[in-house]
Amino acid sequence: ASAKPQAALELLPLEQRIKAGVVCAWFNHRRNKMAVDDPRYSCFLSVDEEHIWIPGWLREFTDSDLVSLICPRPLLIEQGKADAIAWWPQILQEFEDARHHYRELGVIDRLEIDLHEGGHEIRLERSLSFLKQWLMD
């Protein structure tokens, strides 16, 4: 299921016709996810997920950098605190790095995070509400 939000985070910077996006259960502190083994989240070092490894990702860019390429378009990040894919305080740190780009352009209201108590899941009502807000004008 994680390949779809991965595609969203990677396609949004490339395709300007996409007017708004939602990334569910994928946005992460990518450097830690890829190279820092930790019991609080799964790390690519200790799991068989080579299909998710992208060359250059570790040393050249991270998720907040991808968000900088989506900015100023609206983006919602959804993440559950109980999702073992990431440790939620690191997600908040990465989100704050991403907010910088929206803040600099004066469009901070276009970037939101839904950090909920659940796990690796989509909160459809929240996602649809966000998309309707930005696409139904």
Q: Can you describe what each PLM-predicted range is?
A:
Residues 70, 77-79:
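Short beta-strand/loop motif that positions the catalytic acidic residue
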Residues 96-137:
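C-terminal catalytic histidine-bearing segment of alpha/beta-hydrolase fold enzymes
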